[in-house]
Each structure stands twice: as C-alpha cells, then as structure tokens.
C-alpha cells in the first residue's frame, strides 16, 4: 500500500451506473456555453473584419479546443493520482510532477539548442514519470499518520526540483525560458501549436479501459492483490498515463496548478470515487473550470491578458483550504 492515512483521504465508492443523467447533461450544456463565449472573447474583434473568419479558425478555435483538452487532462491526472495514493490532496502540483516536467524541458534545451515540440514533450514525459515514481516510492517506505503530510512532502520535493531548475537556468543563462514554462498560458496557441494535445484523447480512453483496475488499486495493495489485480503493474501503468498527460500539457501550455485538485474533489463530494463513472464528470468539469478561468484571464484587465495559471492558483488555493477545513458529507447526484 502506498500510504496509510486518516479516513478523510480514503476513497469512498458508490454505484453510479447512469452517466447521462440530467445534471450531467446540464454540465455539458454549461461547458458548451463557456466554449462559445471563449470563441468570441479576445482583444481582436473578428466581427466585421475582412480576415475575421481566418483569425477565428487560426487562433480562437485552436485555443478553445486546447482549453477543453487540457482541462480534461489535468483533472483526469489528479483523479488517477488521488486513487493510487488514496489521498484527496494529491495532484500534479502537490507531488512535484509539474516541477519534474519543467526540469525535463530544461534538459532538452540543454541537449538540443532548438528542440522540436516532440523532443520537448518526450523530455517532459520522461522526467514526469521519474519524478512521480520517486514520490510514490517514498510514500511506500514511509508510514504517514496524517493525509496532510502527503501533499506537504510533494510540495517540498517540488520546491527542491524547482530550485535545481533555477540553478541550472542561471548557470546556463536560461532563466527567461524557465519563467515561461512555470507560467501556464494559452495566449500563443494557434494552428500548428496545439495538435499534440489530441493525444490526451488516447490517454483518456486507456484510463477508461483500465478504470476498474485503477479503482481496485485505490483500495490498497492488499485488497487489490486479493481481488486478482497486479497492484504494482497497474500503479506503474497509471503513473505512465499521468506522466504522458502532464508532459504534453507542460510542453505545450506550461504549469496549470491545482486543477487536478479542484475538480476530482468536487466530483467525489457527490459521487464517491468510482473511476469509470466519475471520469466523464471529471473531464467535463475540468473543461469548464479551465475555460471559465481563461475567460476571466482575458477580460479582467482587458485589453491585457493574465496567465490562466494565476487565476487557477488563486481558485485552487481557496478550494484547497476549504477542503482542509470542511467536514464533507458525500451526496449523490440523481
């Protein structure tokens, strides 16, 4: 078992066979509305312009698609991480995974002066996997009495890796690039710069296919093994999928903090922790959350644009503190 912690962090399972319920359909409609608002939000007014339609398909459509795919990826990564570690406070931001992916990007730039997007993604994915496995191995060797210790350990590990990245950046005069990676923004997304995000769809399908095994892994090593699941193999597989999702997002977008913490916890409050039935909910709410934050980032100080990571960090911090302080009673959506 990766960690033994207080009951607050333990998964709670409910049977939800129906996906297309009234609340889920309403959630999809809300996300579609947010997507439409995103398509027509920006400094450049595409209406009535000669090149309006061209700009619409070159910049607005790719940005909105990137928002949807990225929101689903990071929320999904947080959900799988929380199941594997049996801790509700774990996600790529609180495990150091994002910092490891940034370190991977730095090493790619050190090896290849002008790396391609594929090379950047490969470096980010490999380092994300290594960093996440180091975090998981540490949890397996240390008995923790409180669930709160787990994210603290992850944040400390992330701080160390961030310091290493900063040192290497200063040493090789790459501090500006590092600052860019640590700030997630969709401002530069356009045709030709986001297409690899479609790989997230494959990751989502794989997670859905292995959802039952990942859910059993969330019960702990002893229970999962007794039910015929190869615990170590499924944890390794889940970690690989998380690393692919986080690595792609890090290379294309940058750091998007707390999204994997906010969404899975909101969903689990109402639906428990069954991965197969929760995955559509997590993806949809993840899409809506990041799209709403991006719309705010584009309009709050218009005509200027804030990095969406700043909005996410602010919202995520409030939600994180609320989760720590609130005694939650799961309710079921009907």
UniProtKB/Swiss-Prot annotation:
GO terms for cellular component: plasma membrane. Keywords: Cell membrane, Ion transport, Iron, Iron transport, Membrane, Transmembrane, Transmembrane helix, Transport. Disruption phenotype: A mutant lacking both fpuB and fatCD permeases is incapable of using petrobactin as an iron source and exhibits attenuated virulence in a murine model of inhalational anthrax infection. The keyword Manganese does not apply. The chain crosses the membrane at residues 24-44, 64-84, 98-118, 119-139, 152-172, 197-217, 234-254, 277-297, 304-324. PANTHER family: FERRIC ENTEROBACTIN TRANSPORT SYSTEM PERMEASE PROTEIN (PTHR30472), PETROBACTIN IMPORT SYSTEM PERMEASE PROTEIN YCLN (PTHR30472:SF27). This is Petrobactin import system permease protein FatD. It comes from the Bacteria. The complex is composed of two ATP-binding proteins (FatE), two transmembrane proteins (FatC and FatD) and a solute-binding protein (FpuA). It holds the Pfam family FecCD. InterPro entries: ABC_BtuC-like, ABC_transptr_permease_BtuC. It is found in: Cell membrane. GO terms for molecular function: transmembrane transporter activity. Disulfide bonds: none annotated. Belongs to the binding-protein-dependent transport system permease family. FecCD subfamily. One of its GO terms (biological process) is siderophore-dependent iron import into cell. Part of an ABC transporter complex involved in ferric-petrobactin uptake. Probably responsible for the translocation of the substrate across the membrane. It is a multi-pass membrane protein.
